[in-house]
Amino acid sequence: MYNLIIFLPLIGAILSWILGNRFSSIPTYIVSISCLFLSMIISWIAFYDIAILKNDFEGVSLPWINSGEFRALWEFNFDTLSCVMFLVVNTVSAMVHLYSVGYMSHDKSKARFMAYLSFFTFAMLMLVSSNNLLQLFFGWEGVGVASYLLIGFWYNKKSATSAAVKAFLVNRVGDLGLSLIHISEPTRPSQ
C-alpha cells in the first residue's frame, strides 16, 4: 500500500494529461487533486506506522540493470527519513494543487499545468525514496525536467523561457556534483 505514495502522483499526471486533452478542466482537477490527497493521507499513515511505531516495510524491489558484474535494483526506501520527506512533499504538493485551481482558473492549459505539477511531485518522491545513486539520479533528472516545464509553462513569454533555460543549466551543475560523488565513491549501486 505504501508504494502508492510514490506512484499516485504519476498516475495523476498521466490521467490529467489524457483527460485534459478530451474533457474540460474539472475532471483533470478532480483526478490530480484526488491522487495527491490520497498520496498525502497514505504518507501520514506511513509516517505514523514506520516513524512512530517503528514498523518495517519492504518496498518494491525489482531487478533493473544487470550487466556483467554490475547489478542495480529498482527499489524504494521506506525509513523514518523517507517517511518524513513523503509527508512534507505530499502535504505541500497537495496544498499547491488545491491552490492552483483558483490560480490557474483563467488559463486555457490547466490540464497541462496539473500534469506537470503531479509529475514534479512524482519525481521529487522518487528522489527522496531512492535506494541507490543511479535511481537517485533519475529522480534528480525528473525534478530537473519538471522544473524546466513548470518554470517555462507560459512559453510565449520570453522571461519564462529564459528562466526555464537558466534553471535547466543550473540543474546540470547538480548533475556534475552527482557524477563527482559517484566517481569519488565507486561503490555498487545496490547490495
Predicted feature residues:
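Functional transmembrane alpha-helices
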Residues: P9, D79, Y116-F119, M126-L178
